[in-house]
Design a protein with these regions (language model features):
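Short linear motifs at protein or domain termini
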Residues: 1-96
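Short helix-capping and inter-helix turn/linker motifs at the boundaries of alpha-helical repeat units
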Residues: 5, 104, 170-173
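Mobile beta-alpha loop/short-helix "lid" or hinge segments that flank ligand
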Residues: 58-59, 154-156, 171
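Short coil/turn segments
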Residues: 98-99, 170
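Conserved amphipathic alpha-helical segments that form helical-bundle/coiled-coil interaction surfaces
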Residues: 100-164, 175-188, 193-201
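Conserved small/polar residues in nucleotide/adenosyl-binding loops
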Residues: 202-209
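Basic polycationic patches enriched in arginine
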Residues: 212-214
Length: 214
């Protein structure tokens, strides 16, 4: 049994498990097993489930139970549109100002992602975080961390989509290649290249993702 003192702590655990797909879309969440798992009273679990529903992560159906929500592909597509536009602009601003030290940091982070992606047993949580860290580099360099955090926290469906993207077998070599193409564009200061490259990175695996989110 896991010991948690507050509903906020229990919420944080379940939110993370939904976003990292430990709890898949359509999975059932029952009050009794959650009470036993967290050593919490039913009233506290109900507060947690209600908050998860308010944030679009679960759906509570009276007398039937609670399930993890399916991905809303329309919302995901809009968030990808937003992410592509913002990140391409940040890259255009960053590229002419990129220092040798920043280029070296980007290379190290891209190499770290590639090493995780090519491991015999892939840790998808670490891989997802390595990808986030790489993209965070140019936002941080341009002093756009508020924008970065806003994009990361925009909607749970987007975070789940990105995790599903990361876990899509056969797609990691393409992601590594996309990273290298973005880095090459930074190094040659090819400002026109960023929007199509970022668009390709975020939209290319969609058919398999759509199937797996149903």
């Amino acid at each position: 049994m896991e010991e948690y003192k507050t509903d906020a702590e229990i919420y944080a655990v379940l939110e993370r498990e939904i976003i990292d797909l430990t709890l898949r879309p359509g999975s059932s969440l029952s009050e009794n097993p959650l009470c036993a798992r967290f050593g919490a009273p039913r009233s506290m679990i109900r507060v947690v489930l209600q908050r998860l529903q308010e944030n679009g992560l679960v759906k509570i159906v009276p007398y039937k139970g609670t399930t993890v929500t399916r991905l809303n592909r329309e919302i995901v597509d809009e968030l990808i549109y937003e992410r592509t536009a913002v990140e391409a602009r940040v890259l255009r601003d960053f590229s002419p100002k990129c220092t040798p030290e920043q280029r070296a940091l980007i290379r190290r982070r891209a190499d770290a992602y590639a090493a995780l992606a090519r491991a015999e047993e892939i840790d998808y949580n670490k891989l997802y975080e390595a990808d986030r860290l790489l993209h965070e580099t140019w936002f941080a360099a341009m002093g756009k961390m508020y924008l970065w955090r806003t994009l990361q926290n925009a909607h749970a469906d987007y975070s789940r989509f990105r995790m599903l993207d990361t876990m899509t077998s056969g797609g990691l070599d393409e992601v590594i290649a996309d990273h290298q193409n973005i880095i090459a564009a930074i190094e040659r200061c090819d400002l026109a290249a960023f929007e199509p490259l970022v668009c390709l990175l975020y939209t290319s695996p969609s058919p398999r993702d759509t199937e797996r989110s149903r």
